[in-house]
Amino acid sequence: MEKKEYRNRIRVILAEKMITNTYLAEQLGVSKMTISRWCTNTTQPSAPQLIEISRVLQCDLKDLYEAIEYYA
């Protein structure tokens, strides 16, 4: 059975745009640890936070996530 899992691409976009975790944390008013957890997909940002992330990173919301398909 094929399944999909969604992972955020925040780390990838930060690297592409040469933006630091510290800068993103300051812009969003969250800790650097929170950004680190998002970048490793340990936790996920809320919907309002995703909107703010897309604004700060100047990217579309759809670019913040990717689907990973696998068989279970």
Report each predicted region and the residues it spans:
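A short, Lys/Arg-rich alpha-helix, primarily the initiator
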Residues: 1-19
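Short, charged recognition helix plus adjacent turn
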Residues: 12, 18, 65-72
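Key DNA-contact positions within bacterial/archaeal DNA-binding proteins
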Residues: 22, 33, 62
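Recognition helix of helix-turn-helix/homeodomain-like DNA-binding domains
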Residues: 30-44
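DNA major-groove recognition helix of helix-turn-helix
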Residues: 39, 49, 68
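DNA major-groove recognition helix of helix-turn-helix/homeodomain DNA-binding modules
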Residues: 48-63
